[in-house]
Amino acid sequence: MAKAATSKKEASKVEAKKPAARLGAKKTVSKSEESVKTSQSVKNSPSRTGSSSPQKGGKKGAVGEIKQVIGAIVDVQFEGALPNILNALETDRLGSRLILEVAQHLGENTVRTIAMDTTDGLVRGQKVFDTGTQICVPVGEATLGRIMNVIGEPVDEVGPIVTTKTRSIHQKAPEYIEQSTESEILVTGIKVVDLLAPYSKGGKVGLFGGAGVGKTVLIMELINNIAKAHGGYSVFAGVGERTREGNDLYYEMIESRVNVNPKENDGSTKGSKCALVYGQMNEPPGARARVALSGLTIAENFRDEGQDVLFFVDNIFRFTQAGSEVSALLGRIPSAVGYQPTLATDMGALQERITSTKTGSITSVQAIYVPADDLTDPAPATSFAHLDATTVLSRSIAEKGIYPAVDPLDSFSRMLDPLVVGEEHYAVACQVQTILQRYKALQDIIAILGMDELSEEDKLLVGRARRIERFLSQPFHVAEAFTGSPGKLVSLEDTIKGFKGLCAGDYDDLPEAAFYMVGSIDEAIEKGKRLMAEASS
């Protein structure tokens, strides 16, 4: 009886020492249920004070204490069994809930964890509770129209995400036998993309570019064009980018009716098409290293329910960068250019999950920042192997004022195959690239000797190349406020027709300016006639 009374007292002490936030209402229904189960598990678990050697696999509700805090890395010591690798631990930080993810098992019953939020306010000796599971996020239609953080908590101040469905952010990639192998083009309405580097439905697309060449604007235009035409669900993962851009995107989605404004709909987001998961620049590296996985988990759930999902990531380089920061804090020896030694493994674990199955598809569009415009940098170079199409944004094209600043010669797609796109499309794309390649080769001669030294044939080719270059520009819907021009969505048929005529020389009589920032070729002809009439008057 005395022993039983003692154990009850010990259990009540453990209960009393739990953080206040743990007993409060959670932001998702599923989390509160998990919290109740965890507290019962702690209450009913036997005292482990007598155990000195770590047992295999810690039990849910095990209690440890903080031994060391180094930035985003927290060392926690347990008496008895250690939590499994990737388990989520929970503690109190200045009255709010802080999640730690187990990364390493050290000696002396200690685990090294990565914090999913800032560690300000943590102290040595503070109690930490093992949840017994990995980080789980809410999934399903309740997430649509909402902004969540890395652990699935809503940050849009619209109330809790009411769902009982949650899913671990660490999942295995689908088996090879489950994957779909069909090839189909995803038409974006952007001329340069659809003609020269078409996207694959259910494939992976990379937008490569340095700082300030238009990656985010292009992603926002793709969301606007595809999400509207496509009609399915989308998931946007903001990884280590500007908070302002995330805020703008949220309101633009409401304005373009992709999402429903909950403030005008009695707090409901029913009818929304896109879920947003943000881990922005100001977040610790732990959050930035995991937020892409959180977004992907939501997308995978929709795919497994039979949906065709669009998954946008801005920016995949920040995922690598966060992994590099975490790796250094964990004490791993850096690899090439200071990146983590597990760079290829980390990237592969994420990218292999972004795939289409026989149930549904995930079409992924990923912005990839290129440090110092160097495509051979290990971070962008590691991404190349996983992509079905690459859209390379060039600073030299942006300097000419041509937007989107897509490099027509560096961009590539495995879909540009006559068996997939058809003979006409393939032939026109090859003609355009041949003319632009010849123009690029002649630019040194033009710069040194001038146009007069070229042959008549080359002069004609240069004129066509300059018209093609300008016709590759296009006004965007999401940039209307900046350009003052209404956005244009161009069908694939109109795109092929326009470039076929340009290559054949059908529009050699029109001024070059007629082809700049227009949609279809008919608009260019109309603009050209207007310019010629103004010049002659």
From Swiss-Prot:
The keyword ATP-binding is annotated on this UniProt entry: yes
Record's catalysed reaction(s): ATP + H2O + 4 H(+)(in) = ADP + phosphate + 5 H(+)(out)
An annotated GO cellular component: proton-transporting ATP synthase complex
Biased composition (Polar residues): 44-55
PROSITE patterns linked: ATPASE_ALPHA_BETA (PS00152)
SUPFAM superfamilies documented for this protein: C-terminal domain of alpha and beta subunits of F1 ATP synthase (SSF47917), N-terminal domain of alpha and beta subunits of F1 ATP synthase (SSF50615), P-loop containing nucleoside triphosphate hydrolases (SSF52540)
Pfam families given in the database record: ATP-synt_ab, ATP-synt_ab_N, ATP-synt_VA_C
Subcellular localization, as worded in the UniProt entry: Cell inner membrane
Chain sites annotated for binding ATP: 209-216
Gene Ontology MF terms in the entry: ATP binding; ATP hydrolysis activity; proton-transporting ATP synthase activity, rotational mechanism
Biased composition (Basic and acidic residues): 7-18
Membrane topology, record value: Peripheral membrane protein
Enzyme Commission number(s): 7.1.2.2
Annotated region described as Disordered, given as residue ranges: 1-61
Keywords, alphabetical: ATP synthesis, ATP-binding, Cell inner membrane, Cell membrane, CF(1), Hydrogen ion transport, Ion transport, Membrane, Nucleotide-binding, Translocase, Transport
Annotated family: Belongs to the ATPase alpha/beta chains family.
Subunit structure: F-type ATPases have 2 components, CF(1) - the catalytic core - and CF(0) - the membrane proton channel. CF(1) has five subunits: alpha(3), beta(3), gamma(1), delta(1), epsilon(1). CF(0) has three main subunits: a(1), b(2) and c(9-12). The alpha and beta chains form an alternating ring which encloses part of the gamma chain. CF(1) is attached to CF(0) by a central stalk formed by the gamma and epsilon chains, while a peripheral stalk is formed by the delta and b chains.
Name this polypeptide is given: ATP synthase subunit beta
Species annotation: Bartonella bacilliformis (strain ATCC 35685 / KC583 / Herrer 020/F12,63)
